Structure formats: structure tokens, C-alpha cells
Amino acid sequence: LSRNEDEQKARLEAFADMLEGVLGTQLPDPANPEKRLPFALNQIDMAHRRSELDFKYRLEKGFYAQRLFEGIDEIALPQEWAPEYKKESGWVLNGSIDLLFQAPDGKYYIVDWKTNALNSRREGFNRQGMQEEMDKHFYTLQYLLYTTAFLHAYAKSNPEWKLTQEAYDELFGGAIYCFVRGIHKGQGDANGFYATRPSFRLIERLFHELTP
């Protein structure tokens, strides 16, 4: 093989290794990331997952940063975050969730794909390295909005459902960020998988402040 062919083959092998790792590794439990869920993504059938799930709704109450996060210490706000930032009512919130799936236990999980290089070494994809990346790009706000959008859509489709602590615990499993450059086939750790589950207290506030 020529040098170019060797390089292409190496890239394909690395991609296949990553893909098998992403799909075949038991996912960390967002409620307790040190533990594993009893399934991998390749065990979720097509009927129980949705890709590129778009959402769009009007913020009838506006968006007031200080009111949303005041007194909340479970997330790290970026230094450039302006607590006085606000948008008046009528602002439209929209986005797209990479993957939403329902697990065998009936809970729903949000998955987001990230190709961030971090420090270009697999060791950089440990919990601390991924946390720094989450804080740096404020992906925290992203999964909070995704979670709120999902619950809003679920409540709209199920009028009898009400957001309570018990209902939240039974319905939502959490969010999992897959930093794919740090994942490989047969890995024995959770490197590359950032799993988290926001508190009911925070989600309840966002749900009532952001949804109609």
C-alpha cells in the first residue's frame, strides 16, 4: 500500500474503533456517573429513539438570566455570563437534540455528540477534562435547555402529566455527552462519556420560567 493508502486505512480503522466504542460501551448512569447503566446504545431499537429532534417554542415570559439561575450553585456559569442579560417576552427558543431515546426501564435520555479534541490525548477525556470542556463552552446551558424542551414537549403530548419530583424521577434519566475522540472499542472506563442529571429544583424553575 502507498503512504496515502496506509493513512486512509488507519483513519478508517480508528473510525471503526471509535464507532464500536460509542455504540457498544455500557453508558454511565447520569444519576451516578461512577456506575454503569445496564445497556449500550446498540441495544436501543429504532422504535425507541429519535435523531435530530427539533424543538421551537415562544418564551412568553421572556428570558431573565438572573431570575433563572439566582441561588443555583450546581452549575458553573462562565465568567463572561451577564446576570442582567434578558430578552423580553415573545423571544423564540429553538434547537435540535442529537438523540433522544427511551431505555428498557422506560426512562428517557438525551445524547449529544461532541468532536472536541481537548488536549488530543485520550487521558484528557476523563471526568475532569470533560468537565472543563463543558464549563468552557457552557454545554451545561445546552443540556438544561434540551431537558426543558423535552419535558415541555412531553407535557404537551400528555396533558395529564404534571412535573413533580416523582414524575421527573420516573421519566427522565439524564443527559449523556459523547466526546467521540476519547472513546474506543473495549474500553474499561467511562472516558469520553460525560453523564449528568440536573436537579429537579433547577429543572422545575426552568420549566415554569421558560415554557408557556
Task: Give short role names for the model-derived ranges.
Residues 1-212:
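Structural signature of nuclease core domains in nucleic-acid processing machines
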